Amino acid sequence: MGVFSAFHYPKWSMRRKLFGYMILLAAILLLALMAGLFLFGRFDSTERRTFESLDIQMEVFEKDVSAHFDRLAAESLHLSEDMTVFLEEYLAEQEITFSDLTDSDDNIAQIQDLMIEHLRQTLLQEDCSGVFVMWDTTVNQSVANAEFSRTGVYLQQNGYKNTDESILLYRGLAEVGKKHGIMPHRKWRLEFQTDQFPSFDEVCALSGLPLEKSYYLTERFTLPGTSEEAVLMVAPIVGTNGSFYGICGYEVSASYFTTYHAQPTKIAHLTCLLTSGGAQTLDADAGLSCGVAGDYYRTPNGQLSVKSAGDGLSYFNGDEVSYIGLTREISLSPNNQPHTVAVMMLRADHDRAVMKSFLQNAVLWALLLFFAVSCCLYFSRHYLKPILKGLEQIKSEDRTEIQSSVPEINDLFVFLAEQDRQHEESLDAVTREKQTVQQEKEILQSKYDHAQQVYDTAQAEYVRAQEELTEAKKELDRLAYSRKDEIDPDDYQHFLSGIRELTKTEREVFEWYLLGKTAKDIIAATGIKESTLKFHNHNILKKLGVSSRKQMLRYAALMKQLEQGGIADDTCGQAE
Amino acid sequence: MKRYLSVLLTALLLLSCLTACGGKTTLDPDNPVTLTMWHVYGEQADSPMNRLIAEFNATVGQEKGILVTVTNVTSTSKISAQLEAALTGDPDTPEMPDLFSTHTNTAEELGTEHLLDWNTCFSEDELKNYVPEFLEDGTMNGKLVVFPVSKSTYALFLNGSQFERFSADTGVTYDALSTWEGFFDAAAKYYDWSDGKPFCAFDYLIRHVEFDVMAKDGALEYTEDGWYDLQNPSLEESWMKFARSLAQGHIVVSDQYSNTQVMTGETLGGIGSTAAITYYNDTVTYPDNTSEPTNLKVLPLPRSGDGEQYMPMTGVGLSAYATTEQKAEAAAVFVRWLTEGERNLDFVVETGYMPVNNDAFEAIEGYEFPDAGYASLFDAIKTMRDGYTPVVRPAFGGYYDKVDALYEGLRQMQGELRERSDNGESADILAKEIWDFFCSVQ
């Protein structure tokens, strides 16, 4: 929940939070997609895919090459057997031995004349660029280098069509060839030169082996007089008595190999190589190569150093061109070291494919990311738009006619409308109450104003009364002052002692009188009856020893003045 | 609106032309364009053209993104039929190549609309570097559809080793072969000297009859259907001159290529394309397997009388199958590279052709040739270039089918005629039979 707690950040808007959730969802989906692609192998490296493509191609090429040379080996053996039978029949017919053929131009011409049609048919039937039979004899031992010269017939295909018209006589008697409609090759020679054809001695040495184990694939060599290079599948021709008659076999020229083994593949610029050599270097010059049917390939040249490239692939680095691919050993003959077949593509192509794959992935994921972010932005905005609009509308005054595409918002509007209605009802009630209170307030204010007026009036009266009282006191003081001498000190002392004898009620009434209240005021203030007041008045006057209320007030005024120090000391002195 | 569209289309067309051969390059070194090529240089032998192509692929081709792949090395006699088969989609024929050697008549048969106009790829200044006659020879309907790479003519090739012995015994010299009269006389002597061997094999016999007529009349008229005017007495006269020698076995029509008959010792010499020098072996091998150095001696064509002499101007050029702009640009780069002065010189010297580049032609004077055979070839070429008028080969429809039929018939006849001659029949009568056969070819 730690991830989600981040979305509770209070300052984040709803849009940002929703965007965050959606981005998180998109990231999870992308991760799931990546995991799925990884599980189903869609995330394999370019090297891995290259290896798988080349591995399949290797199966095809290896099978093609193996089948082709196996067939040629078998046909070489058949040709050898046929030639043995043919020669021995001829020798028997002529009652001569094989050695009698040497220097015998007639016999050699007849033999060539008899065998050339067979070779022509063989050449037309087999997947090869040439067929030859080389007899271990010569038409003239006396010529220079006769030890290398061997008679025989070598027919070659010329051009891309394997047709009768395109067969040429590369080695053999020109007259015999012409007799059979086979024109001499531009670089025709009468006989073979064993020093220019590889492996004559090697195959001669194999003649002691059982025939089925005696075939041999030569190294690539340049056909004398031409720029064409070729390999020969060679078998010895051995007599029934074990004597060596010569060799025969089939030619696979470099250009024929290129055409015949062109691979129908979509791997651009595929290069296939059949060569001898080990694991460290491939000798391209010694091999035959082919490419893609309908496309081109870079013919490998020179020594290709082999370095591991990982994922089962190897780099093949040449002086001019480098490749990437794989190799396998292949056995084409029991008398040859294993050959190597290599299926390669241009390293530059591969590097471009790696870069392209990387860029594609980068672009793909960038697009996915961009798409995800855009979608999150768009959908979060699109999703929140009615909600935010609804929220904005909630803030608005009038929500009665609002309709949202979000049912929850509509429910909220219904709820808020109900709330509004209730609120307005409450508001009306409060307003009405407020009006009532206002009215009451106004009444009270009016009353207050009236009371205030009364109060002011009373206050004015009070002030006036106070002034009157003050006047009265002044008068009293003046009177007391004037009549101080008229008061009998004993009476006054009696008066003072009589105050202490007053009852509580009497004292209260006495005080009211001292305050200047009239009898009527005292009745109103105390709530006693007039008769009761009179009773108290009587008792008060009696106890104070005065005859009238007027006298009592005079004595009382005198007392106050004395208490306040307002009368001359002599009075007080007298009183004491 | 139509005007606007036409202006737009014109602009696009111009743009496409510019991008094809002049403007921004369409070539990409990282993604090379492949040009398949059929050519005729070095069939069945060491091909100088293939070596040049390998050099191009490893240098300029790699730098610019062009890979020329040779898918067929054939001969001038076969390539026309092969191209026509490829163009019509013959199932046994590879796809039409992007570049191919061709004659103008083949180009016409293929249809010039299918071929690249090299004028769009080369500037006028660039074209000034080439021999104008050769450019003219490759131009059809205002389009340069066959770009001259090399031009050849005919020459007399001789087995020098044997000729020396023959000369020592008979007194016949090379100078004697400078005229047809001397040539036929020498042929007769050789036939006797060699116990019945032909002196010379002819690859293109009828052309020499043509030149002989032209030397006499100054011109040769063809019929409306593109064949020889058999009513022309000069034609019959010239024909009979060759036919007498042929009937007696002094000369032969070659089986296929005269050089093979020279190197097998069947004949002393051969008259064929100067380009045949590539195919001559260093040695001549006889049926008893004895051999001797060829010591090739090449002479100009024998002269006919004292008038103006003529020599053929043959040799294919390069045409490009019009496909994509990128291939057009690549083809132009390759052809420009191939025909540059020094390279053109090296190429033609090696293949026995005449250069097409003015600079190369001038430089050939001081060239150091690899062997005496090549030196004598270019001496012969120089002699003919200085003293003979070049004549382009006929380009009539169906002409070469008739020529092939003529040669095939002569091959069939010549053995029997020689026997009859040996048996004493009149050479004139036998030659008349040959003339009659010539007249029968339709």
Q: Model-derived features: where do they sit?
A:
Chain B
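Conserved N-terminal structural module of periplasmic/extracytoplasmic solute-binding proteins
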Residues: S6, L18-T106, L417-Q442
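Short amphipathic alpha-helical coupling segments at ligand-binding clamshell hinges
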Residues: P48, E237-K241, Q326-L338, K402
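Extracytoplasmic "Venus flytrap"/periplasmic binding protein-like
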Residues: Q62-E133, R165-D169, L268-G269, P287-T290
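Hinge/lid segment of periplasmic solute-binding proteins
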Residues: F100-A155, E181-F184, P293-P302, Y367-D371
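Extracytoplasmic/periplasmic solute-binding protein
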Residues: N141-V149, Y154, E181-Y228, T267
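Glycine-centered hinge/linker elements that transmit conformational signals in sensory
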Residues: F184-Y191, T223-D255, L301
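Extracytoplasmic/periplasmic substrate-recognition and gating elements
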Residues: A247-Q248, P287-P355
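Conserved C-terminal helix/tail region of periplasmic/extracytoplasmic solute-binding proteins
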Residues: E362-E365, F369-Q442
